[in-house]
Amino acid sequence: MTLKTLKRVIRITKQLLKDLEMLLKQTEGLGINIYTHGEMLPSHGYEGLKKYKHLAGNFGGAWQDQQKQFDNLPGCILMTTNCLMRPRDTYKDRIYSTNVVGWDGIKYIEKKPDGEKDFSEIIKQSLELGGFTEEQEAKEILVGFGHEAALSHAVELVEAVKSKQIRHFFLIGGCDGARPGRSYFTDFATMVPDDCMILTLACGKYRFNKLDFGTVAGLPRLLDIGQCNDVYSAILIANALSDAFGTDVNGLPLSLIVSWYEQKAVADLLALLSLGIKNIYLGPTLPAFLSPNVLQYLVDTFQLRLISNPEDDIKTCLGQAV
């Protein structure tokens, strides 16, 4: 498929869907197309946002590629939460921030006492910019498997496990980064056996979410649960499956392969540990704040593991000899 030729474009990035909704309302009918970026990708799975026809698609990937990607965008950018890198001079005059994110020299959009925001300045500038002048090639991917959507297939998932059509679930996701070692997560996903299902969330998904994983038991093998905040959805899905099988989450055929980077990942990891979830694989590095004693406690109590190599880790998850 190709994207429409765009006269004007605004790209909105990071997590806050409320900002996206306000922007869509204020740009409706103005000839501006809105593209998501980064962790705004899951917004295309929400009916309340999909109803806006000028929510045109997703442009770009994880946060660490933003400087190159924003360079090539003939429009404005709205940054709604963190992971803002130093803006280059080539786009510094057309990037805006709001909420807790900002940078010296870029424009900031305040929230009004009633919670609303006035995006008129970024809208005005986007109308003045040329936008895309020719068709842009695009690829369609499947999103929108938060807990409500995923659990609407709970009966099928349970039956597929009981009939051995699905052998194992792998949750592969978390924060992405630019340092070496993160190709592990791409390699891991591509090595997962065909009779296993992959769940993913957060910007770590961009390591493999454009690959074709096919189907298993009549369902997509890759289910995109959402943003890093949506670890909550992953927990609800795991709890529902554990109830169906009469076990706890640790008794499920489920392995968590988490890519580690920054503070939101801290909250996600602590949430999982607070629920007693064990055997989490973490990498490519461990959190810097873990002292040797704390790390040993987590290893002894929760069997927290540092990733090794994809092939051996998959075998361990599946209970095979390494």
List each language-model region with its residue ranges.
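Anaerobic metallocofactor- and corrinoid-dependent redox/one-carbon enzyme cores
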Residues: 1-322
